[in-house]
Amino acid sequence: MPLRIILLGLPGAGKGTQADFIAKHLDIPKISTGDMLRAAVKAKTPLGLEVKKIMESGGLVSDEIMIALVKERVKLPDCHKGYLLDGFPRTLAQADALNAAAIKIDLVIEIDVPEEEIIERMTGRLIHPASGRTYHRRYNPPKVADKDDVTGEPLIQRADDREETVRHRLAVYRKQTSPLSDYYAQWEKSGDPQAPKYFRISGLGSMEEVRERILQVFEAYDPRDSGNLEH
């Protein structure tokens, strides 16, 4: 039975790592909107040519085009066992459009991490610019504070990892994407047979612990039942 999945969670919740694991574990493609746009442009499909024109003029690709691309992509043979949508939908309008286009979703997994933990994870990252070596103040600290272990040169914090930038990204997510949690939870509760199952799991702990919770979701998932698994 195919398994078509959406993964939700704040930036820094570990979605990328777990998305790679899910795709490999289930042998399904991870479909990211960025990859889809690039592939359509490269393939010079009618949609791709339209996307190229929009991107070259610095415009934003409309939800209508994104849905058409998703619809085209999930018809390809590698999606016969299912697929994982990565970074889509991001808004309620996109979720509604996905549903209206009859693009089937079986399972929505939300990785839940408190905002203060996200801020600590992201603002703690340090990088050695010349080599690309990365550290973390809490999880992987350098031997000498703020110095590269190999050269002793200063480590820097990327602009993206500064606290004000992280807080801004979280605020944007809260406004645009957080409502999707309620959208899918309420849809499931409505008893609509087309509704995907919604599971929320804790994203705290090690990568392996989060992975284990995802495996528990797959064990608990039954298309005939509704199930909200919270740890």
From Swiss-Prot:
Pathway: Purine metabolism; AMP biosynthesis via salvage pathway; AMP from ADP: step 1/1
Keyword check for GTP-binding: no
InterPro entries with a match to the protein in the record: Adenyl_kin_sub (IPR006259), Adenylat/UMP-CMP_kin (IPR000850), Adenylat_kinase_CS (IPR033690), Adenylate_kinase_lid-dom (IPR007862), P-loop_NTPase (IPR027417)
Sequence segments annotated as region (NMP): 32-61
Gene Ontology cellular-component terms listed: cytoplasm; cytosol
Chain spans, region LID: 124-161
GO molecular function, one term: adenylate kinase activity
Subcellular localization(s) per the UniProt record: Cytoplasm
Subunit structure: Monomer.
Name of protein: Adenylate kinase
The gene coding this protein: adk
